């Protein structure tokens, strides 16, 4: 059967108007019905019989057809559908209805629709033009706004208010369309009709706005957006943040938003009565829309919605029912063998890091942390229904030009669902979600922000410290509970924001000061800092070897471009392996559980001591971070169980982040006045961290030159304190009644250092130095505790000098202090 030919004239309708028969569409309908009846699979069975049987169910009305099957069956039919899609679409739906009737009893008034999947060509949003109106297209983009589902009038039945005649099946052209004239020959009514809703046909209708993805965007261009119209079963198939493919056609619709302005101009000058004015607002204005002002715009009528890249998790990165078998079926044999080979690689951890960031030299710990963030932990739900996040949040703090933004850009390009934004240019609504008014329905709808767009992905936030405080508070909930709660303009909703956050921040003043703790170097609040699992600090230090290596790497990139990049695995290999590894749900073994508890206890003990000062307080959130990192390590090795070796690496990475000890030189120039003040307020001291910071920030007092040189590095101070503590603990274990005084410790230390002392001046200096160290261990770090024997004597015996009283004090090690490894 040949397709083509002009439309032939047909019969006349009741009103005497001539109807035209579309022969091309009729032939398409007949050929398409034959295709549905005759299309066979590899096993010889009909491909669409089972799908058509599903259409008998009341809630189903759409048949999905693979467009490649049509091309294989009849290329001319496929070409006609592609070029004349909007013209032949109603006839294709009738063919589906005829095919479904062969499967069983179907209500006479039930409408059916068709959806085409796997359409070969894909158009960019920027390439849509009026030349493509009515043809079958496939476009892709990221959903930024979804409207609620409404019923749409597709075919109306009207009642003439003059003669009570019924006008059936008036097709609605994307706006409220009344009959042009009453079908009664003796009635000349053209305006007064009422809609009979019981006999009219409605269909589910939803508007979705999509935007160009960052990869398709030309450099320096503003992203274009287009409205998608979804009907029937296609509604609610795309959520805000999804990257989807839409198959359908480009159409022209009246611009309803221009109606208000047009009506306002029209009604102010018109001398009409109240009734006519009401009709003008409700019916006549819509009827005249686009006729006077030519207010039309392009929209996309979609029949099918699919994931942009389902093989790499373009839409659903963490599908709960995803199994190893289903992922394997999506890969070729060679791809699956490569994934299996990677899982057996004994040096997988290192190779993944180098392959993921080949252009960044060094910073191995940050590469490992970002890699574990991409694998992620296991999300859990307690018996009470509380959700525990599995995503890992990472913050990179560093001096300028230390490749912070490069890490963020690499992750954005690699991850299938990542959003890159800047903290200073982002508001709270832009990061979470905004409530905006629809220009047509004047209803409030939710427009997704960066965290919603990155749902099931990674949100990269640069210049995180430049955000306003009120904007930082807005993401508290998203970082821990992974939801966004909105109560604005009558809209109350809780939205998902299951995203990992990779943030980059600059220190206060532009340079990281080692003499201050992390919280004083970064302009971030304590609640925000506690929600990050890993903190990495980058300091721009002058190192001849490192500077040479970095310069060589940069020059190689500029000279040879991609040739100088050495990758063990390609980006596609890592994406496939990441998708496969993320379906593992590792369980914590008994040995790993005990090891996690022991490591957390060590972190808490280390945080309580004054010497090993932490970046921030160790809380239960760090315990949860340790669990998430351990699960991520197990996922990376495709293990179903978390082993102690996974916990060990997670603890090492967490320790690099948490115990970032700021070690300025220790000065002993405080004088004896502080000693007296400390002694009086011994019970009201602050914690060790604050005491350490107070000591660091104090200016050097003007003292005699005898005390001016009493300084030592923090490493030397720590070494001496460890020697003293080890000696005291050894003496307490060997002797039942051990009474070590300050004098005993001084004499023991000088005896140990006898080989290094040559002159009397050095002896006096060493003696004064060890006395100052012991004084600091007692009053500042609280590692040693003094017990005063003079309390047992009478008041007359206590009239001694301060030196005698000090020498008489018994010293013991604080029982809560634990030596570092």
UniProtKB/Swiss-Prot annotation:
Keywords: ATP-binding, Cell cycle, Chromosome, DNA replication, DNA-binding, Helicase, Hydrolase, Metal-binding, Nucleotide-binding, Nucleus, Zinc, Zinc-finger. GO terms for molecular function: ATP binding; ATP hydrolysis activity; single-stranded 3'-5' DNA helicase activity; single-stranded DNA binding; zinc ion binding. It catalyses: ATP + H2O = ADP + phosphate + H(+). The gene is mmcm6. Component of the mcm2-7 complex (RLF-M). The complex forms a toroidal hexameric ring with the proposed subunit order mcm2-mcm6-mcm4-mcm7-mcm3-mcm5. The heterodimer of mmcm3/mcm5 interacts with mcm4, mmcm6, mcm7 and weakly with mcm2. Component of the CMG helicase complex, composed of the mcm2-7 complex, the GINS complex and cdc45. A motif (Arginine finger) lies at residues 530-533. Residues 665-707 are annotated as: Disordered. ATP binds at residues 398-405. One of its GO terms (cellular component) is CMG complex. Residues 679-689 have a biased composition (Low complexity). Acts as a component of the mcm2-7 complex (mcm complex) which is the putative replicative helicase essential for 'once per cell cycle' DNA replication initiation and elongation in eukaryotic cells. The active ATPase sites in the mcm2-7 ring are formed through the interaction surfaces of two neighboring subunits such that a critical structure of a conserved arginine finger motif is provided in trans relative to the ATP-binding site of the Walker A box of the adjacent subunit. The six ATPase active sites, however, are likely to contribute differentially to the complex helicase activity. Residues 697-707 have a biased composition (Polar residues). This is Maternal DNA replication licensing factor mcm6. A zinc finger (C4-type) spans 160-187. SUPFAM superfamilies: Nucleic acid-binding proteins (SSF50249), P-loop containing nucleoside triphosphate hydrolases (SSF52540). GO terms for biological process: cell cycle DNA replication; DNA replication; DNA replication initiation; double-strand break repair via break-induced replication; mitotic DNA replication; regulation of DNA-templated DNA replication initiation. It is an enzyme of class 3 (hydrolase).
